[in-house]
Protein backbone atom coordinates (compact mmCIF):
# COMPACT_ATOMS: atom_id res chain seq x y z
CA UNK A 1 0.00 0.00 0.00
CA UNK A 2 2.83 2.34 0.97
CA UNK A 3 4.65 1.54 -2.25
CA UNK A 4 1.52 2.32 -4.31
CA UNK A 5 1.09 5.66 -2.50
CA UNK A 6 4.70 6.57 -3.17
CA UNK A 7 4.31 5.75 -6.87
CA UNK A 8 1.12 7.85 -7.07
CA UNK A 9 2.83 10.73 -5.31
CA UNK A 10 5.82 10.60 -7.68
CA UNK A 11 3.45 10.39 -10.65
CA UNK A 12 1.58 13.49 -9.48
CA UNK A 13 4.83 15.39 -8.99
CA UNK A 14 6.02 14.43 -12.47
CA UNK A 15 2.72 15.54 -14.02
CA UNK A 16 2.92 18.88 -12.21
CA UNK A 17 6.51 19.29 -13.39
CA UNK A 18 5.64 18.56 -17.03
CA UNK A 19 2.64 20.91 -16.94
CA UNK A 20 4.69 23.82 -15.58
CA UNK A 21 7.54 22.97 -17.92
CA UNK A 22 5.14 23.12 -20.88
CA UNK A 23 3.68 26.44 -19.74
CA UNK A 24 7.17 27.90 -19.33
CA UNK A 25 8.23 26.70 -22.78
CA UNK A 26 5.15 28.26 -24.42
CA UNK A 27 5.73 31.55 -22.58
CA UNK A 28 9.43 31.55 -23.49
CA UNK A 29 8.75 30.88 -27.18
CA UNK A 30 6.06 33.57 -27.27
CA UNK A 31 8.43 36.04 -25.59
CA UNK A 32 11.18 35.22 -28.11
CA UNK A 33 8.76 35.81 -31.00
CA UNK A 34 7.78 39.19 -29.57
CA UNK A 35 11.43 40.20 -29.14
CA UNK A 36 12.29 38.99 -32.64
CA UNK A 37 9.42 41.00 -34.13
CA UNK A 38 10.47 44.05 -32.15
CA UNK A 39 14.03 43.68 -33.43
CA UNK A 40 12.80 43.29 -37.01
CA UNK A 41 10.63 46.38 -36.70
CA UNK A 42 13.59 48.44 -35.53
CA UNK A 43 16.26 46.94 -37.81
CA UNK A 44 16.43 50.16 -39.81
CA UNK A 45 17.71 51.98 -36.69
CA UNK A 46 20.90 49.87 -36.72
CA UNK A 47 21.24 49.54 -40.50
CA UNK A 48 24.13 51.74 -41.64
CA UNK A 49 23.00 51.67 -45.27
CA UNK A 50 19.46 52.73 -44.33
CA UNK A 51 20.74 55.52 -42.07
CA UNK A 52 23.13 56.79 -44.75
CA UNK A 53 20.37 56.91 -47.37
CA UNK A 54 17.95 58.52 -44.94
CA UNK A 55 20.45 61.22 -43.98
CA UNK A 56 21.01 61.94 -47.66
CA UNK A 57 17.27 62.26 -48.30
CA UNK A 58 16.99 64.67 -45.38
CA UNK A 59 19.30 67.10 -47.20
CA UNK A 60 17.45 66.85 -50.53
CA UNK A 61 14.37 68.87 -51.34
CA UNK A 62 11.06 67.63 -52.68
CA UNK A 63 8.80 70.19 -54.32
CA UNK A 64 5.06 70.39 -54.94
CA UNK A 65 5.44 69.43 -58.60
CA UNK A 66 7.53 66.32 -57.90
CA UNK A 67 6.63 62.67 -58.38
CA UNK A 68 8.12 60.43 -55.68
CA UNK A 69 8.83 56.72 -56.07
CA UNK A 70 8.87 55.31 -52.54
CA UNK A 71 9.78 51.78 -51.52
CA UNK A 72 12.49 49.17 -51.05
CA UNK A 73 15.17 47.73 -53.37
CA UNK A 74 12.70 47.14 -56.20
CA UNK A 75 12.09 50.88 -56.31
CA UNK A 76 15.64 51.91 -55.48
CA UNK A 77 17.30 49.93 -58.28
CA UNK A 78 15.49 51.61 -61.16
CA UNK A 79 16.46 54.84 -62.92
CA UNK A 80 12.94 56.25 -62.90
CA UNK A 81 13.86 59.77 -63.92
CA UNK A 82 15.58 58.53 -67.06
CA UNK A 83 12.96 55.86 -67.80
CA UNK A 84 10.23 58.49 -67.95
CA UNK A 85 12.48 61.32 -69.12
CA UNK A 86 11.02 63.44 -66.34
CA UNK A 87 13.22 65.62 -64.12
CA UNK A 88 10.42 65.96 -61.54
CA UNK A 89 10.72 62.29 -60.56
CA UNK A 90 12.53 61.60 -57.27
CA UNK A 91 13.63 58.09 -56.29
CA UNK A 92 13.21 57.47 -52.56
CA UNK A 93 13.76 53.72 -52.47
CA UNK A 94 16.06 52.03 -49.95
CA UNK A 95 17.24 48.43 -50.26
CA UNK A 96 15.76 46.22 -47.53
CA UNK A 97 13.20 48.78 -46.41
CA UNK A 98 9.98 47.80 -44.65
CA UNK A 99 6.70 49.48 -43.76
CA UNK A 100 8.26 50.52 -40.43
CA UNK A 101 11.21 52.06 -42.24
CA UNK A 102 8.91 54.02 -44.55
CA UNK A 103 6.97 55.36 -41.57
CA UNK A 104 10.20 56.40 -39.92
CA UNK A 105 11.32 58.55 -42.87
CA UNK A 106 8.01 59.70 -44.32
CA UNK A 107 8.48 63.26 -43.03
CA UNK A 108 11.30 63.83 -45.52
CA UNK A 109 8.74 63.34 -48.28
CA UNK A 110 5.46 64.78 -47.02
CA UNK A 111 7.07 68.07 -45.95
CA UNK A 112 7.62 68.86 -49.65
CA UNK A 113 3.96 68.19 -50.56
CA UNK A 114 4.74 66.23 -53.75
CA UNK A 115 2.22 65.98 -56.56
CA UNK A 116 2.22 62.16 -56.60
CA UNK A 117 3.69 59.28 -54.61
CA UNK A 118 4.12 55.80 -56.09
CA UNK A 119 4.37 53.41 -53.14
CA UNK A 120 5.49 49.79 -53.22
CA UNK A 121 6.47 48.26 -49.87
CA UNK A 122 5.84 45.08 -47.90
CA UNK A 123 7.83 42.22 -49.41
CA UNK A 124 10.58 42.51 -46.78
CA UNK A 125 7.94 42.53 -44.03
CA UNK A 126 6.64 39.23 -45.40
CA UNK A 127 10.14 37.79 -45.66
CA UNK A 128 10.64 38.70 -41.98
CA UNK A 129 7.45 36.74 -41.16
CA UNK A 130 5.42 39.79 -40.17
CA UNK A 131 1.71 39.03 -40.10
CA UNK A 132 -0.65 40.67 -42.56
CA UNK A 133 -2.53 42.60 -39.87
CA UNK A 134 0.69 44.30 -38.76
CA UNK A 135 1.68 45.21 -42.34
CA UNK A 136 -1.78 46.58 -43.13
CA UNK A 137 -1.76 48.61 -39.92
CA UNK A 138 1.51 50.22 -40.98
CA UNK A 139 0.14 50.80 -44.48
CA UNK A 140 -2.85 52.62 -43.04
CA UNK A 141 -0.55 54.74 -40.87
CA UNK A 142 1.53 55.63 -43.94
CA UNK A 143 -1.54 56.59 -45.98
CA UNK A 144 -3.11 58.53 -43.11
CA UNK A 145 0.10 60.49 -42.53
CA UNK A 146 0.32 61.41 -46.21
CA UNK A 147 -3.34 62.42 -46.20
CA UNK A 148 -2.82 64.58 -43.08
CA UNK A 149 0.56 66.15 -43.89
CA UNK A 150 0.13 66.49 -47.66
CA UNK A 151 -3.60 66.32 -48.46
CA UNK A 152 -3.27 67.29 -52.14
CA UNK A 153 -0.83 64.47 -52.90
CA UNK A 154 -2.23 61.60 -54.98
CA UNK A 155 -0.96 58.22 -53.78
CA UNK A 156 -0.59 55.20 -56.05
CA UNK A 157 -0.23 51.99 -54.06
CA UNK A 158 1.42 49.47 -56.34
CA UNK A 159 0.84 45.80 -55.64
CA UNK A 160 3.79 43.82 -54.34
CA UNK A 161 5.48 41.91 -57.16
CA UNK A 162 5.77 38.12 -57.31
CA UNK A 163 9.09 36.33 -56.78
CA UNK A 164 10.25 32.82 -57.63
CA UNK A 165 8.86 31.28 -54.41
CA UNK A 166 5.34 29.90 -54.92
CA UNK A 167 4.53 29.73 -51.18
CA UNK A 168 5.71 33.30 -50.67
CA UNK A 169 3.57 34.43 -53.60
CA UNK A 170 0.44 33.11 -51.90
CA UNK A 171 1.16 35.50 -49.02
CA UNK A 172 1.93 38.29 -51.49
CA UNK A 173 -1.34 37.75 -53.33
CA UNK A 174 -3.35 37.76 -50.10
CA UNK A 175 -1.68 40.99 -48.93
CA UNK A 176 -2.28 42.62 -52.31
CA UNK A 177 -5.99 41.81 -52.07
CA UNK A 178 -6.09 43.55 -48.69
CA UNK A 179 -4.12 46.55 -49.98
CA UNK A 180 -6.62 47.01 -52.78
CA UNK A 181 -9.34 47.55 -50.16
CA UNK A 182 -7.48 50.65 -48.91
CA UNK A 183 -7.98 52.49 -52.21
CA UNK A 184 -10.04 55.69 -52.43
CA UNK A 185 -10.37 58.81 -54.61
CA UNK A 186 -6.82 59.93 -53.77
CA UNK A 187 -5.36 56.48 -53.12
CA UNK A 188 -5.26 54.56 -56.38
CA UNK A 189 -4.35 50.86 -56.40
CA UNK A 190 -2.29 49.57 -59.35
CA UNK A 191 -2.19 45.81 -59.88
CA UNK A 192 1.27 44.86 -61.13
CA UNK A 193 1.27 41.34 -59.68
CA UNK A 194 -0.95 39.83 -62.37
CA UNK A 195 1.15 41.41 -65.11
CA UNK A 196 4.35 39.85 -63.79
CA UNK A 197 3.23 36.46 -62.47
CA UNK A 198 3.42 33.32 -64.61
CA UNK A 199 2.73 29.81 -63.28
CA UNK A 200 2.58 31.34 -59.78
CA UNK A 201 6.13 32.71 -60.03
CA UNK A 202 8.14 35.63 -61.37
CA UNK A 203 9.36 34.47 -64.81
CA UNK A 204 13.11 34.19 -65.33
CA UNK A 205 12.94 36.56 -68.29
CA UNK A 206 12.24 39.44 -65.88
CA UNK A 207 14.83 38.67 -63.20
CA UNK A 208 18.31 37.29 -62.58
CA UNK A 209 17.96 36.46 -58.89
CA UNK A 210 14.28 35.56 -58.58
CA UNK A 211 13.29 38.77 -56.79
CA UNK A 212 14.78 41.90 -58.33
CA UNK A 213 13.90 43.01 -61.84
CA UNK A 214 16.19 43.32 -64.83
CA UNK A 215 15.92 45.89 -67.61
CA UNK A 216 13.01 44.14 -69.31
CA UNK A 217 11.16 43.91 -66.01
CA UNK A 218 11.49 47.62 -65.35
CA UNK A 219 10.39 48.41 -68.90
CA UNK A 220 7.16 46.49 -68.27
CA UNK A 221 6.68 48.24 -64.93
CA UNK A 222 7.10 51.57 -66.70
CA UNK A 223 4.57 50.62 -69.37
CA UNK A 224 1.99 49.60 -66.75
CA UNK A 225 2.15 52.88 -64.80
CA UNK A 226 2.94 55.29 -67.63
CA UNK A 227 -0.60 56.68 -67.79
CA UNK A 228 -0.50 57.48 -64.06
CA UNK A 229 2.90 59.17 -64.15
CA UNK A 230 2.25 61.47 -67.11
List PLM regions with ranges.
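Alpha-helical scaffolding segments of alpha/beta enzyme cores, especially the outer helices
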Residues: 137, 141-145, 174-181
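N-terminal secretory targeting modules
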Residues: 1-66
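Catalytic His-Asp segment of secreted/periplasmic serine-dependent ester chemistry enzymes
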Residues: 164-230
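Active-site segments of SGNH/GDSL-like serine hydrolases
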Residues: 123-126, 144-174, 196-199
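Active-site flanking residues adjacent to catalytic metal/cofactor-binding acidic residues
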Residues: 70-72, 158, 190
Amino acid sequence: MKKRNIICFISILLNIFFIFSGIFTIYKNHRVQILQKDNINKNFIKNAYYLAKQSQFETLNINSGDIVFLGDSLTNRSQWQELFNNSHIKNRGIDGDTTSGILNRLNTITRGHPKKIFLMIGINDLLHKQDTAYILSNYEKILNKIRTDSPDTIVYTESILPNNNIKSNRDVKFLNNELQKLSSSKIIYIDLFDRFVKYDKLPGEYTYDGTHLNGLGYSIWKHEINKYVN
